[in-house]
Amino acid sequence: MVRTINETFLKACRGERTDYVPAWYMRQAGRSQPEYRKIKEKYSLFEITHNPELCAYVTKLPVDQYNVDAAILYKDIMSPLPAIGVDVEIKSGIGPVIDNPIRSLQDVEKLGEINPEDDVPYILDTIRLLTTEMLDVPLIGFSGAPFTLASYMIEGGPSRNYHNTKAFMYAEPKAWFALIDKLADMVITYLKAQINAGAKAVQIFDSWVGTVNVADYRVFIKPAMERIFAEVRTMGVPMIMHGVGAAHLVNEWHDLPLDVVGLDWRLPIEEARARGVHKAVQGNMDPSFLLAPWSVIEEHVKGILDQGMKQPGYIFNLGHGVFPEVNPDTLKRLTTFIHEYSKGQLAK
C-alpha cells in the first residue's frame, strides 16, 4: 500500500518553497525518551535493530511525540560492517569496538561485499514496515561515510585524535584507497537497498572527517564521496551530507552531487551561504541550548530561522545529536515553535 505523506521536508531538500520550515533532530529517537529507556532496560541495541516491529516503534516514537517532519531509521552506523567481515561490538560507555582492526593491505583484501537482502534483512524489513504501514512523514535512510567507518576500523574504536587513521592514510596510500573504495562500494549498495525498501531520502554521516584538512580531503576522501553521491543520485531521492567540526569542508561538500549540506553550530548559515553554499541547508542549532531555559532557546532559534529562511531550501536540525539529558517536552515545544514562527514569517 502506498501511503500519503507530508512532503514538506522533501520539498525543502529539493530547494522548493514551503509553507513552514520542516524540522527533525539527529538522535531524535533515543536516550532522551522515557519510553526508549524502558525498552533499553529489556533489550540491547542489537536486539532492537534486529527486531523490525520494535525498531519501527522506536523510529516512529519521536514523530508522534515531537511532530517532526521526517523520521530517521533507528540503527547504528556500524550496522553494515559485520556483513563485510568486521567484528564489531557496541560497548556501553565506550561505543563501537572492533576486534580485528585494519593494519595492512592484506587485511583490506580479506573484506567481503555486502548483500543487503541476505546480510541486513531486518533493516530492510523495518523500512518496509514503516513506509507501508506506519509513517505519514518521509523516512530517512543513512550510512556512515567511508572515512568515519575506516577510522573505526583502523583505530579499533573511538579516538580523540585519529592519529592512527591519518598515519595509515599517509603511510599506506595503496591500502588506504583500497579500503576507502571497498567501503564506498558497500555504502552505495547499502543506501540503494534502503531506498528500494522505501526510504525517501538518505543522509551520509561523516562524523570524524573534521580532523582532515582540505588538501587531504580532496586527495584521500573526496573521490570516493563523489562516486557514492553520483551512483546513489540515480535513485532519485534527496541526499544529505553531514559532519561535525567540518566547517572548513562545506565547499568541498557543496561540490559533490548532493542536495543538502548539513551544518553544525560552528558555521552560521549566513556565512555558509556567503561562502557560496547555494544548495539546500540543514542545521544548525547547538544541542547544548536544549538544556537552557525556554526563553533562551526561543531567542536563539529565532536567529537560526531568520538566517535559514532567507532562501528556499532550509531544514531545521541540530548540529549534532540530542543529549540524553534533554527533556522530551522541550523538543515538542521546539518543533511547535519552529513551525508556527516560520509559517508566520514566510507568509509575510
Swiss-Prot record:
**One GO cellular component term noted in the UniProt record for this chain:** cytosol
> Gene name, please?
hemE
Per UniProt, subcellular location reads as: Cytoplasm
Native organism is Bacillus anthracis
Q: What is its EC number?
A: 4.1.1.37
Q: Which pathway is recorded for this entry?
A: Porphyrin-containing compound metabolism; protoporphyrin-IX biosynthesis; coproporphyrinogen-III from 5-aminolevulinate: step 4/4
Organism's domain of life? Bacteria
Q: Name one GO molecular function term.
A: uroporphyrinogen decarboxylase activity
Q: Which family does it belong to?
A: Belongs to the uroporphyrinogen decarboxylase family.
What name has this protein been given in UniProt?
Uroporphyrinogen decarboxylase
> What does this protein do, in the record's words?
Catalyzes the decarboxylation of four acetate groups of uroporphyrinogen-III to yield coproporphyrinogen-III.
Q: Which InterPro entries match?
A: UROD/MetE-like_sf, Uroporphyrinogen_deCO2ase_HemE, Uroporphyrinogen_deCOase
Statement: the UniProt record of this protein carries the keyword Cytoplasm: yes
Keywords linked to the UniProt accession: Cytoplasm, Decarboxylase, Lyase, Porphyrin biosynthesis
- Matching PROSITE patterns, A to Z? UROD_1, UROD_2
What does the record note on quaternary structure? Homodimer.
